[in-house]
Amino acid sequence: ARQHVGNEPFAVLLGDDLIDPRDPLLTEMLALAEHTGESVIALMPVPPEMIDRYGCAEVVPLEAGLSVAGTGLASGEATNQVRIKSLVEKPAPEDAPSNLAIIGRYVLQPAVFEVLERTQAGAGGEIQLTDALATLATMPTEQGGGVTGVVFQGRRYDTGNQLDYLKAVVQIAAERSDLGPAFRDWL
């Protein structure tokens, strides 16, 4: 991917995380990345017993008074924008720094490629993006580091989970203006 994005920030959207396209999550993430010059990850609260399925974030509110262009939000003032202090991949519930799971939306700065090259295999014996992001979170913004997050409260389906996949198909089909009425009648 490095040769395609060059020295520009880029978005990564994992295919098994389905988020309502009408939701402004990615728009907010792009605006935050442009404003801060840092990578941005999407986070979502999950029950403690599910945190071991996800990367997990330790966060603090963004600095009060930081206006985030294009979002109409000022961080630190009852917003959903946070600074990432640390990240851990698939922690045991008792070791998790929070209940904020990393979900499949990222806006990454190009420095992530160099960090990934230096990242050792982690959870599952694989090089984990979460581990590279944890390193970026400790680096100065001037070096491509720093990571912020947007806490998502909208509708999301993990289509790698069979039940969530079925829920997504039914819900989205039922809401379509062209197919919804006939589909709902059939149901």
Regions found by a protein language model. Name each.
Residues 1-60, 65, 108-110, 116-119:
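Conserved beta-loop-beta/alpha segment of the NTase-like Rossmann-fold superfamily
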